[in-house]
């Protein structure tokens, strides 16, 4: 049985809690430790809950080979061999310790997506508080088991996965002892067009698997992640770069610190606006109630000439009752402007 909330570095994550906002560093460090540290500081300043890394090397993902199926033929990275792309994009593993230490020092959670057992081992040495299974690794059941063995909360992205593949991964995690699991709806297109996102999958996935569900977003701008809050998402992950002009593998679809700050602000405003099921009381001055518009004497019979429905409201006789007052007698003398009450009638 999965819990309905995760606890990551002391922060509760789930549908009864504020959205957990993850700034995904990905390849935007540009293999520069100083730039990576800038991103950690900027994510904290923007209000993100976590900065997330990716822990792999070209050799742990693929092999150096010039056969045709190792060559990227389309998409944003076309014209490169896989090995060369990953060799350019990976974060040097020696960066991890300093980034984890910095994040802890300034008060932002740092965790990572491992891509093999050696990455899990490194992250365990750094006491990573949670793990993220990237979309392409959802079908790597051994990696899920390796992560599950740590006993930490697990977030799994589902880009490109069929419903049966997601169900298989969830079962593997459950059987391996994971009790804190979150799924992320994801579209593995870079950048992803809005009409490919299908946000209605979020509540469906939540119902299907009885776990918290959020969004790993690759669209441009904030519209889609903000909308995910309204359909019940509880986690938002977005790629994050210091400057869109940075020549990194992911910069062209990543958000800047200013955009991240705007996202965080927007999410928190929407969370306030979502509120709860609520209907207002009726004591509103902008509504109308029934008034006397002429002086009347005690015992006088009312006609249309005496009555009007108008503002301010708040009186006990609503406009719908006005017709029933015609022909009734008042039991006291009343001046024009009186907000009528039922006790005023014989």
Region annotations inferred by a language model:
Residues 1-346:
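Catalytic cores and adjacent flexible loops of soluble metabolic enzymes
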């Amino acid at each position: 049985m999965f819990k309905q909330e995760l606890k990551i570095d002391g922060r509760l994550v789930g549908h009864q809690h504020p959205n957990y906002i993850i700034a995904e560093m990905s390849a935007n460090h540009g293999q520069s430790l100083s730039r990576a540290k800038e991103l950690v500081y900027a994510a904290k300043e923007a209000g993100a809950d976590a900065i997330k890394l990716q822990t792999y090397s070209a050799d742990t993902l693929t092999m150096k080979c010039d056969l045709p199926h190792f060559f990227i033929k389309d998409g944003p990275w076309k014209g490169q061999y896989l090995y060369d792309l990953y060799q350019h994009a990976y974060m040097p593993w020696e960066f991890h310790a300093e980034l984890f230490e910095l994040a802890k020092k300034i008060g932002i959670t740092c965790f990572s997506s491992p891509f093999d057992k050696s990455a899990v081992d490194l992250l365990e040495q750094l006491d990573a508080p949670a793990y993220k299974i990237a979309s392409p690794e959802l079908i790597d059941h051994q990696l899920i088991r390796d992560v599950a063995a740590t006993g930490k909360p697990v977030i799994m992205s589902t880009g490109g996965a069929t419903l049966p593949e997601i169900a298989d991964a969830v079962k593997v995690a459950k059987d391996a002892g994971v009790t804190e699991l979150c799924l992320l709806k994801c579209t593995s297109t870079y950048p992803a067009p809005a009409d490919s996102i299908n946000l209605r999958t979020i509540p469906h996935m939540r119902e299907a698997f009885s776990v918290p569900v959020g969004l790993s977003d690759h669209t441009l701008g904030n519209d889609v992640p903000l909308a995910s809050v309204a359909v019940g998402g509880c986690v938002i992950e977005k790629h994050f770069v210091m400057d869109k002009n940075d020549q990194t593998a992911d910069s062209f679809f990543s958000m800047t610190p200013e955009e991240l700050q705007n996202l965080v602000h927007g999410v928190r405003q929407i969370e306030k606006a979502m509120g709860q099921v609520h209907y207002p009381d009726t004591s509103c001055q902008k509504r109308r109630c029934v008034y006397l518009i002429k002086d009347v004497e005690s015992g006088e019979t009312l006609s249309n000439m005496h009555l009007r429905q108008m503002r301010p409201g708040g009186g006990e006789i609503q406009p719908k009752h006005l017709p029933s007052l015609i022909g009734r007698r008042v039991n006291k003398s009343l001046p024009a402007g009186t907000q009528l009450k039922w006790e005023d009638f014989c």
